[in-house]
Amino acid sequence: MKDQGRSTRKRTGGRLKHASNKKRHQLGREPAETTVGETRVQYIDSRGNEKKVRALSTNVAQVADGDAVSEAEIENVVDNPSNVNYARRNIITKGAIIETSAGRARVSSRPGQTGQVNAVLID
């Protein structure tokens, strides 16, 4: 279980005594780490009776060129500024530069949160 509450240790390394137990709203999850491949999604319950759609892998992107938006096939991840190793592992995150059938594009959506890849052409 990922906990996004306070740390269990002090700056000096000593243990902290917690005043309360862990709560469900402090719960976190492992990142989706969307890869290039056959489309696979996962539905997750979120707060307020909502659902989140996590893209585990996808091979299509909605690419915007000015006002026109078209669907393009993702070939691979060229660069990913969020992590050096994500580019060689073909992991798509927001800000990643992907090679598509329409050309190079920068990802503008969060595929692990929305379940789809939206991108803007950069060349």
From Swiss-Prot:
Region described as Disordered: 1-37
GO biological process, one term: translation
InterPro entries registered for this protein in UniProt: Ribosomal_eS8, Ribosomal_protein_eS8_arc, Ribosomal_Se8/biogenesis_NSA2
Family matches, as HAMAP family: Ribosomal_eS8
Assembly mode: Part of the 30S ribosomal subunit.
Cited NCBIfam families: eS8
UniProt family annotation: Belongs to the eukaryotic ribosomal protein eS8 family.
UniProt protein name: Small ribosomal subunit protein eS8
Organism the protein comes from: Halorubrum lacusprofundi (strain ATCC 49239 / DSM 5036 / JCM 8891 / ACAM 34)
